[in-house]
């Protein structure tokens, strides 16, 4: 068999397990080259996937997947797993509409045992699977693979606390690729881990504990001595305190260390914790040198790497926010910025450099981020929490209980509102208008273009209470914001076009499509701007001289802005029909943003079609 054809023979982990162990390094080399070539053509998460090639091979070589459950945290590192579990050919459709998902997805493969996209869920899920197996009398393993960044979230520690008490038969693998909690790794650590994970060592360890149990002082002395020695060679004391047996750290790119260690741990019972050191971008120098740039990439030439865009490009909403944040910080010393580990994605790189003392990255900890902001607001500061819509869900109780209930002036700059594209249902921001608008004291805004986004952010600074500015991924109409920090009148919309008979009431990202549809329908078009407080006067005015009102929003139609329009009409006894256009009551799959909007009838043509179907039923 030629070296170049080794990967082509792997259509399932069973094929992998039939290989000679000496062939696995070659398989890793081929798999890494395949991922670089494949992702360069489709885009996707690259550096994190290159860092887990050997770990993925070792896991599928040792464990009987899918009978044994592998649970990947976040999912950014699942591409090698997908290739080895029968989806190699499908990788050419990665993150495309109707193609392979960029994250583990239960409906896609039995090897994807738990759907994921957000962080820090793996230990909880694997614990549930482990205890279910115990309850059903089934002999199978549950393994959670979690990154060091995801370990900063409280949910991970809640799960570990529970797992230690439950004495669950599970394995947690810490994929540590940032060296944030690790000493240097070398041969000594690998040898020690193989030794301490062996059956012989652990049988002797338990026998010794049993014997010393008859002499409690000696048992306590032995326990302290063991912890002291471990503390000298490995940072595992914290995990031992949770009731886990800690092993590592070991080199996550050394198959000769990984496989024997995993084989040993497979034989041991109870909660186990393996600390593995990997390198983001491993094997591709460009990604090794800049793992953040190559974390999530578009299409690129593998030989040249990511190239800077040529020519002027439209400002993205994220850039508009980042520029505003720096400008407002110069104008108002009360402003501070907070991000839950999304500095680059949320547009805070420049702010973090220019105002380092006013910039707070709290890690992957959305709950903490929101309440931390509340504490800052209590002391007279103006905290701005930059967060993706989908991640705001994780801090909902804190938004209600710690911010809104106390009417604290925290600004939420909510990026990725609406459909985000290739990342799919775990990352679409489809619910925020519904779940934030219902909270008392909140002011909720959605800009129609980049210039309006800047004005809304400035408006939020003037509001003595919590507010949210919600904007989409990418660029808008190309409107260039002025350098001024102008504001808007709170709760007032704007008529973009005067027509007759039909009024289109559009919110945020869909105003441009509504204006285009209004031209064809000769309809009035209103840019509503504020979801809360709604411009009730404008709604009543439009209801008085139009026979049909059409609400248009890139949010779940249930409980969204359209429902609020109907509430206003009902409270005033106005019986004008309302056609609500928005996202349907289902999770939207991945695909290009424009393609998804067209499919859901939220582009110009879809709006025209829906209105004509309502006014001229066949």
Curated annotation (Swiss-Prot):
Q: Note the Pfam families from the entry.
A: DXP_synthase_N, Transket_pyr, Transketolase_C
* Signal peptide (UniProt feature, chain positions): none
Keyword check for Protein biosynthesis, yes or no: no
InterPro entries to which the protein is assigned, alphabetical: Dxylulose-5-P_synthase, THDP-binding, Transketo_C/PFOR_II, Transketolase-like_Pyr-bd, Transketolase_C, Transketolase_CS
Functional pathway: Metabolic intermediate biosynthesis; 1-deoxy-D-xylulose 5-phosphate biosynthesis; 1-deoxy-D-xylulose 5-phosphate from D-glyceraldehyde 3-phosphate and pyruvate: step 1/1
**Class in the EC hierarchy, top level:** transferase
Which reaction does this chain catalyze?
Answer: D-glyceraldehyde 3-phosphate + pyruvate + H(+) = 1-deoxy-D-xylulose 5-phosphate + CO2
GO terms for biological process?
1-deoxy-D-xylulose 5-phosphate biosynthetic process; isopentenyl diphosphate biosynthetic process, methylerythritol 4-phosphate pathway; terpenoid biosynthetic process; thiamine biosynthetic process
Per the record's keyword annotation, is Magnesium included, yes or no?
yes
What keywords would UniProt list here? Isoprene biosynthesis, Magnesium, Metal-binding, Thiamine biosynthesis, Thiamine pyrophosphate, Transferase
GO molecular function annotations of the record = 1-deoxy-D-xylulose-5-phosphate synthase activity; magnesium ion binding; thiamine pyrophosphate binding
Tell me, how does this one assemble? Homodimer.
Q: What is this protein called?
A: 1-deoxy-D-xylulose-5-phosphate synthase
Instruction: Give me the gene this protein comes from.
Output: dxs
